[in-house]
Structures are given as structure tokens and as C-alpha cells.
Design a protein with these regions (language model features):
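Phosphate/ribose-recognition catalytic cores of enzymes acting on nucleotide-derived substrates
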Residues: 226-286
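Nucleotidyltransferase catalytic core that binds NTPs
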Residues: 2-236, 245-247, 278
């Protein structure tokens, strides 16, 4: 497995692979990899001849008061996980490798980004779309892999690929959870012992809504109210949003008629965590 920093080095490797008619999978990450990321790499390895993992804490998707400087970084640890999973190349650029001093071109979207995380992080998805678009141009993968935990990001990237005619398939992969139900996240490392326990309120509230839906409840307002009451009972938790939206348009829904995304964002202490369930009721699964 190789680790490279420049666009030219990545393209040189890709060129060699393409000469051999090998398929290429891309797993874009911000590093500090965990079992959730490993599940993406595992799937990419299973479905492609060669796999590139990008490890880049993208400054463009962080707001001015967010955790860019404190976001955890450990390339040695990331490389060990990637190698064990069977990745072939890590692309680990410095910011100046991705954004020149006079960089001024961005990918923005008028739909899908105004609600959910976009409501309180107004420049976030412009940064996400721009860096992912650049990675798609640099690597030119056959398939790119994203986790369902960042459900809005997954929907946005799929829409961008369709709008801009990127010649690749976006593959969404299931959320990977800790044994007690907490969705795996690099930001879980911010939590102290008490906060880690409090964070279980996210999956607990979503599971309660899931049970209600399975029992026949279809009113989004009732479900939302019950989720909020569970979260508000946890002293360390503060709700950013609780929403039920159409999974294709991300527009709010009043009735649960799949496919519907139930997405939540909650502050546990100072740490903002997200989680979700997706309901595909017409297909009879999630």
C-alpha cells in the first residue's frame, strides 16, 4: 500500500491501473478511521480491483467556530486500518495541495442543503461538494463509497453526481454502531465517560420512533414530539434538530410514507452528534 500527497502522484497510480483495465473504488474520509470507515473500505475492496482512500480534513467544510483545529488526526493509525482492510493507496494531501492560494471555484447546490445540517452549517455542503467533486476528478473512480450516518451528505453527493454527469456510481453503506447502539463517529472521542453514556439517547430515541412506526404510527408530528421528549429528558443533551423528511428531496413530511429519513442532530455537552433511520415502507425494508 502506498501513501501519496500530491494530485500528480495519485494520477500516476490511477493511470497504471487503467492501463491494466482495473476498476477503481474511492472511499473519501477525513481520517481518524473507525469500524464505520472500515466497512466502507471492505465493501470497496470486495467490489473493485483497486481502492483509494482519501484522508483529508477539509478546511472548506468547517465553519469559523467549528472543530477544524481539534478534529482528531492519526495517519499512522489510519494507514494500519487501510492496509489491514486491503486498500491500495492513501491520498493524504495538505490543504495547499487541494486549494491553491488563489482558489476561487466552488460547487454549490440550491436544493437539499438548506435544511437539516445545512440550517446551522450554511457553508458546510459547499465545502463538501467542492472537495468531493475535486476527488472525483482526481481519482476518476468507478464507484465511491459513503456512509448512511451522514445521510444528508449521501443525498447531496448523489444529486451532484447526477447533475454534473460524473461517470461513477455512489454506493451508500449502512451505519455501523457500537455494541450499545451509538453510531460510530470520529467525534465520539471528544466525549468524556458521562457524555458517552448520555450520547446513547440518540439511538434510543430513534429506536423508540422505529418501534412506534412498526406498531402503525404514521404521524410525523407525534413521532417527532416523542423523540424530542426522550432527548430532552437527558440533562447533557441539547437538540439541534429532529426531522422526518422525504429521502429523495429532503423536504419535511407530515406522514410516514416511505422512503422517509428520520434524522437527528444533538449536542452532548459541546459535541454535536448525528444519527438517523431510513424507512422504505413501500419496499418493506429500511
Amino acid at each position: 500500500m502506498k501513501i501519496v500527497q500530491t494530485v500528480e502522484e495519485v494520477r500516476a497510480e490511477i493511470k497504471k491501473w487503467r492501463r491494466e483495465n482495473l476498476t477503481v473504488g474511492l472511499v473519501p474520509t477525513m481520517g481518524y478511521l473507525h469500524e464505520g470507515h472500515k466497512s466502507l473500505i471492505d465493501r470497496a475492496v470486495a467490489e473493485n480491483d483497486r481502492v483509494v482512500v482519501s484522508v483529508f480534513v477539509n478546511p472548506m467544510q468547517f465553519g469559523p467556530s467549528e472543530d477544524l483545529e481539534s478534529y482528531p488526526r492519526d495517519l499512522e493509525r489510519d494507514a494500519a486500518l487501510c492496509e489491514e482492510a486491503g486498500a491500495n493507496l492513501i491520498f493524504h494531501p495538505e490543504p495547499e495541495n487541494m486549494y491553491s492560494s488563489d482558489f476561487s471555484s466552488f460547487i454549490d447546490m440550491n436544493t437539499l442543503t438548506g435544511g437539516l445540517c445545512g440550517k446551522t452549517r450554511p457553508t458546510h455542503f459547499r465545502g463538501v461538494c467542492t472537495v468531493v467533486g475535486k476527488l472525483f476528478h482526481i481519482v476518476e473512480p468507478d464507484k465511491a463509497y459513503f456512509g448512511q450516518k451522514d445521510a444528508q451528505q449521501l443525498a447531496v453527493i448523489r444529486h451532484m453526481v447526477k447533475d454534473l454527469n460524473f461517470n461513477l456510481e455512489v454506493v451508500g453503506c449502512p451505519i455501523i454502531r457500537e455494541e450499545d447502539g451509538l453510531a460510530k463517529s470520529s467525534r465520539n472521542t471528544y466525549l468524556n465517560k458521562e457524555e458517552r453514556q448520555a450520547a446513547l439517547v440518540l439511538s434510543r430515541s430513534l429506536d423508540a420512533a422505529k418501534a412506534q412506526i412498526e406498531a402503525g404510527e404514521r404521524n410525523a408530528a407525534i413521532l417527532k414530539k416523542n423523540i424530542c421528549s426522550i432527548i430532552e429528558a437527558e440533562p447533557l443533551a441539547r437538540i439541534d434538530y429532529v426531522e422526518f423528511v422525504d429521502w429523495n428531496t429532503l423536504e419535511p413530511v407530515e406522514t410516514i410514507e416511505g422512503p422517509v429519513l428520520n434524522a437527528i442532530a444533538v449536542y452532548i455537552g459541546k459535541t454535536r452528534l448525528i444519527d438517523n433511520h431510513i424507512y422504505f415502507e413501500k419496499e418493506g425494508n429500511q
